[in-house]
């Protein structure tokens, strides 16, 4: 999965897809009551990027629904995963449950259309810190109460704050979640980062019987050398400001026969086992 990073303006969706992304990450900004208002990152953000691009969240969902709905004039088959970077650290953790309710409701109304010609992409809920776990409860409770638990099959969970992997597992156990789990590791492109935690996550992913990590990706990679380093470790995905650079690295002799771009036919919740 090549994940376009910080794709917060509607016009950026096709821009990043044209550069080779098959997944996009966008930031969800909440008001003080946990209502999802805008796709917006804000200052500071990655070096060399404009931090202030934004859209109304529901309008953004309406657009990506069209882009991921077969038969729609705007359909792009390559877009298979939407990663919602939930800026919950900006609101009280007491509002995390309400935020989960609101995001689930808006996805039902504007993306899935409650079963009427909705978008098909998989959804990854990027949660900054384990203390915000109530978001997941609010989200799942809403799907159940609204009679649309079928969409759980399309939804995954990812804690993105580089916290202790065993602490993340404990929270997932507490929630009763042991599938559809991704693990991110990374830092803003402005700073270097080693691979210790990334390698630990990959080791857990590859441990037979370990349920709490099915995919691992590294973020935010801008240098080709760091992309190569991550690919050599066998990551499942790379988040980048420059998807075209990732495409270029994947075409190199070392990687061309080892990796391919994920398509809609690839289940993002299953571990990929090399033969």
From Swiss-Prot:
E.C. number(s) listed in UniProt: 4.6.1.-
The keyword Isomerase appears for this protein: no
Active site: 5, 41
Tissue expression notes: Expressed by the venom gland.
Cysteine pairs bridged by disulfides in the record: 45-51, 47-190
Cofactor note: Binds 1 Mg(2+) ion per subunit.
Domain of life: Eukaryota
Needed co-factor(s): Mg(2+)
Molecular-function annotations in GO: lyase activity; metal ion binding; phosphoric diester hydrolase activity; toxin activity
Job description of the protein: Dermonecrotic toxins cleave the phosphodiester linkage between the phosphate and headgroup of certain phospholipids (sphingolipid and lysolipid substrates), forming an alcohol (often choline) and a cyclic phosphate. This toxin acts on sphingomyelin (SM). It may also act on ceramide phosphoethanolamine (CPE), lysophosphatidylcholine (LPC) and lysophosphatidylethanolamine (LPE), but not on lysophosphatidylserine (LPS), and lysophosphatidylglycerol (LPG). It acts by transphosphatidylation, releasing exclusively cyclic phosphate products as second products.
Name recorded for this polypeptide: Dermonecrotic toxin SpaSicTox-betaIIA3
Organism: Sicarius patagonicus
């Amino acid at each position: 999965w090549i994940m376009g990073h910080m794709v917060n303006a509607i016009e950026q969706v096709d821009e990043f897809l044209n550069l080779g992304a098959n997944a996009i990450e966008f930031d969800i900004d909440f008001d003080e009551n946990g209502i999802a208002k805008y796709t917006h990152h804000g200052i500071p953000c990655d070096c060399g990027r404009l931090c202030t691009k934004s859209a109304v969240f529901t309008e953004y969902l309406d657009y990506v629904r069209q882009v991921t709905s077969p038969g729609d004039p705007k359909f792009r088959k390559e877009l298979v995963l939407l990663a919602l970077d939930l800026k919950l650290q900006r609101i009280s953790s007491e509002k995390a449950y309400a935020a989960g309710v609101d995001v689930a409701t808006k996805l039902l109304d504007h993306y899935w259309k409650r079963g009427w010609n909705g978008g098909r992409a998989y959804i990854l809920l990027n949660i900054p810190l384990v203390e915000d776990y109530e978001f997941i409860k609010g989200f799942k409770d809403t799907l159940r109460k609204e009679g649309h638990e079928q969409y759980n099959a399309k939804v995954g969970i990812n804690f993105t704050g580089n916290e202790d992997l065993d602490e993340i597992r404990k929270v997932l156990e507490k929630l009763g979640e042991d599938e559809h789990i991704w693990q991110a590791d990374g830092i803003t492109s402005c700073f270097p980062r080693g691979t210790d935690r990334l390698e630990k996550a990959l080791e857990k992913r590859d441990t037979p019987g370990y349920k709490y990590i099915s995919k691992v990706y590294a973020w935010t990679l801008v240098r080709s050398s760091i992309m190569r380093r991550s690919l050599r470790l066998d990551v499942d995905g790379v988040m980048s400001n420059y998807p075209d650079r990732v495409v270029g690295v994947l075409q190199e002799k070392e990687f061309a026969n080892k990796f391919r771009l994920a398509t809609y036919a690839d289940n993002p919740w299953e571990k990929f086992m090399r033969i």
